[in-house]
Amino acid sequence: MSSHLKNLTENFENLAINPIFNTNWCDMPAEIKVECVGKMELTERLSLRSTAKAERSLVDSQKINIRRCAIHGLPEIRRVTLASKTGKIVFRAFRSANKEFEFLKYIWKIGVFENLYIWLDGKDSKEKLENFNGTIAAKSIDFHFCDEEFIVAILGKVKNGVESITMNADRGISYSVNEILKISHVQNVKYWQIDNYKRMSVLWKVAQVWIDISSKIGTTFQLSTEVYGLFHEFLQHFVDRIVSISQIRVRIRTNHPDRHILLELEFDGFVEFQHSFKFFRLMDMTANTRQKKVAAALLLLQEQESVLLTVCRPYQLEEGLEVIRQDLFSTFLRLNQYMISTEQTKKYLGVELEHFNFLRNLCSDDISRIDSIPAPVRIHIFLKYAREAVCVILPGPAQFEGELEFLVSRVGGDDESMYRVVKKSSCICLQKENCHCHCGACGYRHSCTCLVQETGVCCKHIHMVILRNGSMTPSFFLKLTCTPVSLVDVDQAEKEKMLMSSDINNSSKITEKSTAEPIYDSNWCDMPDDIKLECIGKMELCERLSLRCSAKAERSLVDSQKIEFHEGVFLREYEDSSFLFSRNDKVVFWKRTKEINEAFELMKYIKKVGVFEHLKIFSRGVADCERFLADDGLFTAKKMNLVHCDIDSTIAVLRKMKNDVESIEMNGDEITSGKLAEILTISHIQNVPYWHIDCYEETDSLHKVAQMWIDKNSKIDSTFQISVNANGSFAEFLEHFKDRVVSQSDRKVRIHTNNPDRHILLERGLDEVVKIDYEIYRLMVISAEMKESEYDDNCKEWIYKMNPEIHYYDSESSFEARDDDFEWSDGEEA
């Protein structure tokens, strides 16, 4: 009580109200109390609420601004972290959902949140919300791994005025968004984002809601998804509203004459290396936004004696008006000269002459006159030896280096729509029936047989294979000079010839960039080994995988060169295995596969050549293949992080590490006392400078690790940290080493080892004010000469390794209050 009165007295000195009362809280006027409460931090209010029960309603009547409220956890343990505007932290943990929800009811009642972050798993949370009669005031809300019913329940309790809503739908394959779109906050929010969405129809449904309610200009919706066909589906739904369209964006009109809706397909640094994720942005914009319009896209596909001319409307390109104008002019000049000199071609002319003359005159007139052509107009000109089943190809700017991107359409037939095709150069397997690309119309994908395993298309929308013997250099958007080849015309010898030609070209380009001399303009097999090694050393992982397949005779040479990665991630989720590697702050490799054998082969190769700064392994079953344990390969990494791995996978991976690992982090929810003893026999654990276990469930870890250090005479500065969901670890450590104690306090104990130069120091990470359901400890090997005055009493920095969110808000923040110390009145209404 005296400490609380002291805090209140300090607050009084800052008040502008007179007189200043030097008396008990209960004797103060209500207006003074209200002024005091309004200036208190949340921690002070929680303390005052427990000591002044008679006037709890007065304390609760004052709102408080909270910068962030983070609620996360599983049913067995919940954590709530609150950060005030000034950076003060309240961090609480609960094993009881009832206690957690009572605390949240109070926080939601008095708090005005800048950001509300929710990650809860369990039906009990939804059931509690249904009985909550209050409302939540928040500017932005982030839902992480929450199901649809829980999201709807939370949003139903939110006050008007929310500006941003973010949802991670990784578990939301059941999201239909139909119920979510009925909520007024979602309809009127300025910014809405869904990540990892796994269903169709979301884009046009959001746009339709905006049209129906006449949403404000600037309203934005963003989506990341692996689902194919959303862009095409959007076009089909709003075909009568299209204002303009390009390969990556479409603009539609709304019922309001001053407003349009713009849909964009976007890419970033992550998507630069794979096509499975697509990013969309939907925006409500003013209809007066300036945009260069070109009402037609012309493309010329020219062979030796065949010319195809196609005008495709209503496709519009937003740039290059003058370039298109020039291409139109030059195209018709060449075409006119050919037709004048070849009278025989007139009988092959498949178009009305006045249409052709109109297009020819268009070159010198205003290009906007093409709008007068009835849509859709297709003008086909076949010369004498023109092949049948020719496709229209509109080259576009490729998103990634080394790839080609087109809009493709079959001439004639029922389907003359344009479809997006991506030609991948990294795949060298041509054993399938089509090119290795994916279809933007139906999303058809297939796997090839090479190790890279890029994807391909074999569907009704694509009618040809784009292969080449020479270079393919498109001029801006419009003109492509190439030789279209059907795969049925290519025998196995021709395939091998194309592969060899591609390998030589790629090798030559790599050699040109190397510093070695001389530069060889020759086949790969004719190059000296030192040049090959120089080339391989400059290759990224995808290039090496391709070279491994094409140069099997020298695979050992390719595999002899190490490749360094800043970070590597192995993820096993359900039946999927994913690999993601980055270097120089850039993702350089991403792959997902459902085949456990293929995942094992790739992991085996990565163990052989990869050198990681930081290696992370997520989820369960990564090491469940018997061959993983039988394989001789070892991971090379400085830092290892095992996240939510089952205990068998954890032990298997630890046994497959090289000895120079510097840091190991793991979860302890499946580590039993017996498994911990097995882990302590692994040499990497015995010699690693730092390792920690998060959420261990037993009390024997501290003395077992210390005993292992004593037996192995571990080096000074060896460090072990652990969070324990059980009481008694500190006492058990003291009991085990009672004959070795050098010094002891409530939070620290120091023991001697068998080496007179070394002691072991145990520290409790949270002081006596903070009593939460789990305890954090640090164990260190220290010099026997270290004085107690040299101890680091600030625990926040090293606790940051166990719980980064605590350090995230403010380095001066303190930890406050436990649910047992916070009293609630029975039947209180929040």
Curated annotation (Swiss-Prot):
* PANTHER family hit by this protein: F-BOX DOMAIN-CONTAINING PROTEIN-RELATED, F-BOX DOMAIN-CONTAINING PROTEIN-RELATED-RELATED
Q: Name one GO biological process term.
A: cell differentiation
Coiled-coil ranges (or none): none
Q: Give the matching Pfam families.
A: F-box
Entry's transmembrane regions = none
Lineage of the organism: Eukaryota, Metazoa, Ecdysozoa, Nematoda, Chromadorea
Q: What does this protein do?
A: Sex-determining factor which regulates hermaphrodite development.
Its protein name is F-box protein she-1
